Amino acid sequence: MLASKDSLVEALKVALNPENNPKRNFTQSVELIVTFKGIDMKKGELKLREIVPLPKEPSKPRKVLVIPAFQQIESAKKAEPNVLLTKEELQKLQGQKRAIKKLARQNDWFLVAQDSMALVGRILGPALGPRGKFPTPLPNAADITEYILRFKRSTLVKTKDQPHVQVFIGTEDMKPEDLAENALAVLNTIENKAKVEANLRAIYVKTTMGKIVKVELKK
């Protein structure tokens, strides 16, 4: 384990303290930052793109755009996604660059029926790619309510060109203990997928606008 729950709780308490986290006029996200050493990103020594369901649901759910198959529309509505588009509505977006960029900017996840994946790649792909976002295929099952709900509380662990990851773990109105559980879920995924304990440099937590706080590493 890269860090203990106790050390995460203590760091989160400091990060959420008003001295380090002045009151804003919006609910801030809380982020976990993990940095690595001795890794050559150009050689592809660390590649992560993992979807992690958070055990403690954030008060501010992730925003999900869903393009279901016809038989999935009613179950998709039950999950109350941020945006629900039919295949026909997606086709009508062709060439509407401003609307497409807005959808790409305002949503975190893009869940798409498999028969619409190619269309999404053509229409939304140019706006998603530069933002590090991507479509995820929906299962073929008629009932996709729970699948969508899982993404509303999921976060993305993704490396880019630098040896670190910065991951959403919740919101500032959550208990430090709950945020710590979410952080542990992310850290466990990193540890299991990348085997990087020997290359760990540091772990930090912070709110959107707050000061960064270092987490004591497990010895």
Swiss-Prot record:
What GO molecular function terms would the record report?
rRNA binding; structural constituent of ribosome; tRNA binding
Could you tell me the keywords of this UniProt record?
A: Repressor, Ribonucleoprotein, Ribosomal protein, RNA-binding, rRNA-binding, Translation regulation, tRNA-binding
| Cysteines joined through disulfide linkages | none
Its cellular-component GO annotations read:
large ribosomal subunit
Is RNA-binding among the key words of this record? Answer: yes
Alphabetical list of Pfam families matching this protein: Ribosomal_L1 (PF00687)
InterPro entries on file: Ribosomal_uL1, Ribosomal_uL1-like, Ribosomal_uL1/biogenesis, Ribosomal_uL1_3-a/b-sand, Ribosomal_uL1_arc, Ribosomal_uL1_CS
Reading the lineage from the top rank, the first entry is Archaea
What's the name of the protein? Large ribosomal subunit protein uL1
| Species | Sulfurisphaera tokodaii (strain DSM 16993 / JCM 10545 / NBRC 100140 / 7) (Sulfolobus tokodaii)
